[in-house]
Each structure stands twice: as C-alpha cells, then as structure tokens.
Amino acid sequence: NGAAPFIIPAMGSHGGATAEGQKNLLEGYGITEKNMGCPIHSSMDVKKIGKTADGRDVYIDRLAAEADGIIVVGRIKPHTAFRGPYQSGLMKMMAIGLGKQYGASVCHAEGFQRMGYNVQTFGNAIIKHANILCGVGIVENAFDETRKIKVMSKEDIGRMEPELLKEAEQHMPRILWPACDVLIVDEIGKNFSGDGMDPNVTGSFATPYASGGIQAERICLLDLSPETHGNGMGTGMASVITRRIFNQLDVNMMYINAMTCKNLNGSRIPCVMTNDKDCLLYTSP
C-alpha cells in the first residue's frame, strides 16, 4: 500500500549498452509500461554503494540505488560459460545486471575462470550495501514454461539460489543423442540464451570453463529471432549461417556485448550461404 513501483532493466551491457536499447529489449518480451501498469526507467548511470569484501568499488544502477527498495526478479539456470554455486540467477542479476556496463566490465575483467568468484563477491556486497527487499527466482522446465517461482528474503538469496540452480539443471532441455554430424538450429537470439543458442543443449561453448550438451561436428544456423534485435551473439560458434542472418546482424551491438564479456568467439561471423538449402549442403558430411 502506498508504494510507487517502477521497473529497471538489469542486463549489464546488453541492448548495445544504451538505455534505449535495454528498454527495447524489455518491450520485445512484452514488458511494457502499459502491460505492467508502472513506469520503466532505463538508464546506464551508476552510483557507488560500497566495497566488496576484497576492497573493490561496487556500483549499481543509480535509480535502483536511490530507490527505497529493490526486488530482484530473474530466471535461475546453468550459465553458458562458467560453473559455480551461482550461475545465471539473482546473484548475477545484481552483480552484472544492476551494475550495468560498469558491473559487467568489472566482473568480466578477470575472465570467465574467475566469474563464479566475482558474481558471488559482488552479489554479496550488493545484498549488504543496497536496499534489497527480496528476490524472486524463476525456474523453468524443459519447454521454457515456468516450473517454480520462489520468493526469498535478501538474507536467504545466498542460501536458496544454489538449491534452485540444481533443480533448474535437472529440468534443462536436452538432445538425447550424445553426438551428431550436423546440428541444425532454426533460430538463435538473446531471448533464448545470452550466447544466442544455449550451449548446455547445443554443446557450442565459447569458453573452456563449462561443458555439456550434444557434440556436433558442424552447426548450421538458419535465422535470428525478432526479439534479439539483430544481436547475433553465438554466430561465431556455428560452421555456417544463412544470408538471412547476416543481413539482420547489428555488429555494433554484438561487439559491445563481446568486448564487455572479454570473449570474442561468439561474435565472429562464419561462412555465409545464400539460403537454407545451401547451408545444409555445405555442412553435410
């Protein structure tokens, strides 16, 4: 009663690291002011709120820092590039998402081999220094449907998120063959995975710090999702893409994303074929 809620995009450097780009991404998921019944305030400005346990400065979105309270909402699932007790979830949403491009750059500066440590360290610092009210963790099933929604007090986020991550791992989609000659992917996009296509399913990992999924000799990509707004992160892990994908690529958005996370592999452009048929012919054994 009496609250005046508003929504803040918590997505690090996504959306081309611009306020407008991040708001557009939310709108692509149906998160609009009309649908949600409250304002969406998108900004890349950050404010220092304290230091980590190891002495590093902690910054989060300025509007979030100045709000009376923050409710962190996010999906919990295995990450595409590193392993640890906290992967894609609320701790990462705070450390990198609320930290905007600054937070993303700091957490990625030491590479994915240190990402698990940095997510936990910065996440704990934000819980300590920011006005976090609670967290809302979402776990999906293998069909991208909501399996569980768990509300956690800020004191319980650190304890409960690893348990929800284990549950999410058990219900991840998977391809039941261990290996194949050619893997055909109809669409990739940031709405499916930060890497465009989830390597936990496709096996197309861009770092050596995570593994799993099917082992494909070649990967063929046919299209980008409309929701990804031209961000073709993940094309670099394919063998071949269509001209249709190439013509939609917003390379500036891709490169900002790739440079921020210090991993250029996913932003590379592979062989480009005229149509789906040529893609399949080129990759066929």
Residue map of PLM features:
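General beta-strand structural signal in soluble alpha/beta enzymes
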Residues: 6-9, 34-43, 50, 72-73, ...
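Conserved small/polar residues in nucleotide/adenosyl-binding loops
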Residues: 282-285
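Conserved mixed alpha/beta catalytic, RNA-binding, or beta-rich assembly cores of soluble enzyme
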Residues: 100-102, 147-280
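Membrane helical hairpin/interfacial module
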Residues: 3-29
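Conserved, well-structured core segments that form the ligand-binding/active-site neighborhood
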Residues: 60-189, 203-208, 212-214
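Short, ordered loop/turn segments at secondary-structure junctions
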Residues: 3, 10-13, 75-76, 141, ...
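An acidic, phosphate/nucleotide-engaging active-site surface
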Residues: 21, 25-85
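Short acidic, glycine/serine/threonine-rich loops at helix termini
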Residues: 17-22, 51-54, 81-86, 146-151, ...
